[in-house]
């Protein structure tokens, strides 16, 4: 009966009925697209296992009042984290995708050119995030010329642990990097999922202490209070500055400039202050 009435109305008011149907279809499509986008936004970086315990180390932005910066030198963050029992892992790592890097590899008598989106990290930085290796691992990554690549890239270019990639096209540079690990791709949506490989940042001893350029992340024990950890980290840094012989005036400036906060990984996507 309902179908019969619908057909009757459709025949009598064809144009208006079709417009209503089209309008409702567009409305439902819009609602669907909005719900997909909302779900995407709300799950961003939360899809990373243990993301609720991972934080980015930040300090007040010196150029914009009320905002925060996440660039650090290679030395201070480790001093801040030293001896804090709630910290399971910590280190410098870039989890944002950079430009693709040109590589080349010689196979038999041919040279293949590849492009891989690379980031950089120190081994301790990689340990903050839940890398799952299908081949190799982080043991050899500590070597100066060790790199790790994603499983997707390994399959795309038919690469394996032990292969040497030359930086640049057509073997021009002669500078080789050794693939020491192949990891499972991280789930999306997340920043880290866009990175296809990591190269070792190199030794802290060779890094300039006044070079504030690298992000630093920490992973806390389950149930740990990041606010309490912040207090301990700040206390560690103040003690280190005192040992360096900083004056009261210098200490006041440094505390104001570098009092830290731990920004949850799951909230960074929406954070407009950093």
Q: What role is predicted for each listed range?
A:
Residues 24, 95-99, 268:
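Short active-site-proximal "capping" loops at secondary-structure junctions
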Residues 13-40:
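Short, strongly hydrophobic transmembrane alpha-helices
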Residues 5, 20, 29, 33, ...:
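Amphipathic alpha-helical recognition patches that constitute DNA-binding helices
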Residues 119-135, 149-274:
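Mid-to-C-terminal secondary-structure elements
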Residues 31, 35-166, 170-175, 231, ...:
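Structured, solvent-exposed hinge/loop segments at the ends of secondary-structure elements
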Residues 2-13:
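A short amphipathic helical element positioned immediately N-terminal to and/or at the very start
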């Amino acid at each position: 009966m309902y179908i019969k009435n619908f057909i009757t109305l459709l025949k009598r008011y064809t144009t208006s009925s079709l417009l209503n149907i089209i309008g409702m279809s567009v409305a439902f499509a819009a609602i669907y697209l909005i719900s997909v986008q909302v779900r995407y936004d709300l799950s961003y970086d939360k899809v990373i296992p243990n993301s609720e315990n991972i934080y980015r180390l930040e300090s007040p932005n010196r150029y914009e009042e009320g905002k925060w910066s996440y660039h650090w030198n290679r030395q201070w963050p480790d001093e801040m984290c030293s001896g804090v029992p709630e910290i399971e892992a910590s280190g410098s790592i870039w989890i944002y995708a950079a430009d693709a890097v040109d590589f080349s590899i010689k196979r038999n008598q041919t040279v293949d050119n590849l492009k891989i989106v690379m980031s950089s990290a120190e081994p301790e930085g990689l340990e903050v995030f839940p890398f799952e290796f299908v081949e190799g691992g982080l043991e050899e990554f500590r070597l100066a010329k060790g790199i790790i690549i994603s499983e997707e890239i390994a399959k795309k270019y038919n690469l394996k642990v032990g292969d040497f990639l030359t930086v640049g096209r057509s073997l021009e540079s002669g500078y080789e990097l050794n693939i020491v690990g192949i990891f499972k791709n991280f789930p999306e949506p997340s920043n880290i999922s866009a990175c296809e490989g990591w190269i070792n940042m190199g030794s802290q001893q060779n890094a300039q202490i006044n070079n504030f350029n690298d992000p630093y992340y920490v992973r806390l024990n389950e149930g740990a209070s990041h606010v309490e950890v912040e207090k301990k980290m700040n206390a560690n840094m103040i003690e280190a500055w005192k040992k360096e012989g900083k004056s009261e005036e210098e200490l006041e400036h440094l505390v104001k400039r570098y009092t830290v906060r731990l920004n949850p990984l799951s909230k960074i996507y929406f954070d407009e202050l950093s």
